[in-house]
Swiss-Prot record:
MF annotations from Gene Ontology: ATP binding; D-alanine-D-alanine ligase activity; metal ion binding
NCBIfam families according to UniProt: D_ala_D_alaTIGR, PRK01372.1
Name of the coding gene: ddl
Broad enzyme group: ligase
Protein name as annotated: D-alanine--D-alanine ligase
Record's keyword terms, sorted: ATP-binding, Cell shape, Cell wall biogenesis/degradation, Cytoplasm, Ligase, Magnesium, Manganese, Metal-binding, Nucleotide-binding, Peptidoglycan synthesis
Disulfide bonds: none
Organism: Ruthia magnifica subsp. Calyptogena magnifica
Amino acid sequence: MIAVLMGGNSAERAVSLKSGEAVYQALINQNINCFEFDWHGYNLSELWQQEFDQAFIVLHGRGGEDGYIQKQLENRCIRYTGSDSNASHNGIDKARTKIIWKQHNLTLAPSIVASIHKPIEPIDFPLPWMVKPTLEGSSIGISKVDSQIQLNNALMLAWQYNSHALIEQWIEGDEYTVAILGDKALPVVKIITDQGFYDYESKYHSNKIQYLCPCGLSSSQEQVLQVIALKAFFAINAKGWGRVDFIINQHNKPYLLEINTVPGMTSHSLVPMAAKAMGMSFNKLVVAIINEI
């Protein structure tokens, strides 16, 4: 019996519910015994009353993607999809992820962490900047800062979600994402947005976003991204499945942006799109993720 864990109380709850419902329907379509569990982010006593031996985690953001739910399942020897508690803890924190990636000599935009509790250190890289909460996904709470005067408002927005924000040099270029399944990188997807950057509204509510798969890169360029994505994925000890986001500047230099250890599985989501490009249906993708447990 598989428990499909969705919901949570993070800022990504609505997305998680959509992802969870899609995964649940895929399992039902294949006559796989399962049930939905909408966790509201508090105690798990109702979950432990159910009989199940595996969990498909589609809890996005804090509580589901930060190692908490993974640790609870580990303590009960219940197998689950995706990365373990330690890798999840590393992956959700953008600042921690960057430290690990730097140790592996991966290419990143310059950045600093700004805490609500202390003065901001001098920023020694040029404008514009991207400001984002360190512990949120789906581009929630992010802002582009074009002048010093805009920084305070951007930080106040990011600090609504947690007490630390990442101030990162803005890299002008094209956005790409690489889905990973097991030890393989899936076809690269290019993201074209009219918003200036790929924010929450673009991801889940806009019909003006274009996704290209094939992505338009040469086979050698695509392979470079896939190799870097796998290095980034395994650097934080991620496993099972995930997604790594990039931007390529005007000099064709790729920069890592972030990693998602529990990516979206909605109709707009990019992992299903990449899987489809290699001939894998949504139903088969769901089973493939389970098989990586």
